[in-house]
């Protein structure tokens, strides 16, 4: 969609903030932390970051149990409040520098990012600026 708008209007559209929540789905016999580590690796690979560039923080905010920093500015929060569908919520947040880091580090477009989180991870965008 962004590519279409840019092409139609002849202007470059910049995303300066993106936040999305998505469910953490666990099977009965799965250990939460193992699933979380796999999910962090999966998201890191999509964003084109090495495992050494993903750091687990000692704290988290907004009632999430785990928080990771991907690169310098991309925040991933996991295992948050329980959703109506019985799963725990997760959140990805890219502020200004995180948005630029995504654009500069990846060969992917914003449409790729939206598709990954909204379709593949069944996410719900909470804010796009």
Language-model-derived ranges and their functions:
Residues 1-129:
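Structured, helix-rich domain cores that form ligand/interaction pockets
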